[in-house]
UniProtKB/Swiss-Prot annotation:
Subcellular compartments: Cell membrane
SUPFAM superfamilies assigned to the protein according to its UniProt record, in alphabetical order: Aquaporin-like
Keyword line: Cell membrane, Glycoprotein, Membrane, Repeat, Stress response, Transmembrane, Transmembrane helix, Transport
Motif NPA 1: chain residues: 85-87
Record lineage: Eukaryota, Metazoa, Ecdysozoa, Tardigrada, Eutardigrada
Topological category with respect to the lipid bilayer: Multi-pass membrane protein
Predominant location category: membrane
Organism: Milnesium tardigradum
Protein name: Aquaporin-7
Pfam families: MIP
Amino acid sequence: MAHNEKDPSSVEPIKRKRFSNEYVRLFLAEFLGTFILIVFGCGTVAVTILSKHQSQDFFSVNVGFFLGIAFGVFIAGGVSGGHLNPAVTLAFAVINKCKWRKVPVYMAAQYLGAWVGSAILTAIYYDALHNHDQGNRTIETAGIYASYPQEFLTWQGGLADQIFATLLLMMGILALTDERNMVGPTGRAYVPLLVGLLVLAIGLAFGFNCGYPINPARDFGPRLFTAMAGWGTQVFSEPRGTYNWWWIPIIGPHVGAIIGALAYNFFIGYHWPKERDDVQLQSPSSPIVIVKNDAYQPLRPSRSVYSEELRITTS
């Protein structure tokens, strides 16, 4: 065999094991995207806490999650839509933008990706953790991974916080992925960054009470890891132990995302004109005019970040 000829059995062994099953591909994409979210976001929190706030501050933490979300969606978006959040997935299913049979696949991948991301982060910062607490795992270092409320916050206040913050998140996501709205099909490439900026805005405005988890996988996956990795059952309660906290960043975001999805459709989504024969879509900041016959059809075959059901594969 000539030296320039390649043996098919030795070329790209990983590629030869490619998965054609849609559910496997969705799982892998959501797993990796959520993993990226955790290592960037919680990694920024780790630097802040382990350096005793000398290296970074609260704003840096928000930027870390902004970048984690953006890169996570960039990575997973072309395959799964880049939900990275069980509450978002559930809300999409409620408004028929994600098939219900896919919801368990999305959620399993998201929770597992968050758990594995926490494990890798702990391995990277193991020496720094030990230097910080001498092996005495406390809620302070558990805060690297999951959210904990301020001492003054009641469970009712925490639940309201999570419902409202996730409501804003879901409305923003729907606005950014609605091709009839401002972003449109030509701005699709910017959606991951815009979703990251949306999370940044929520963090700056609503991060004081409990750190704005707004994502059950981002919160409970790492929380479960800490319970298994030496922090114990204290991670399921608020710092004083007066009530169980763990369920609030799970229930609140799910409820808030559903309300946000329904609210967006009620105020915006259901009211686009169906017939566009004599209606022009024009950006206020652009002289370009696009004339369409049906506002409910994409301007061209395209992929929509986040909304799995809106994705159309080009050929």
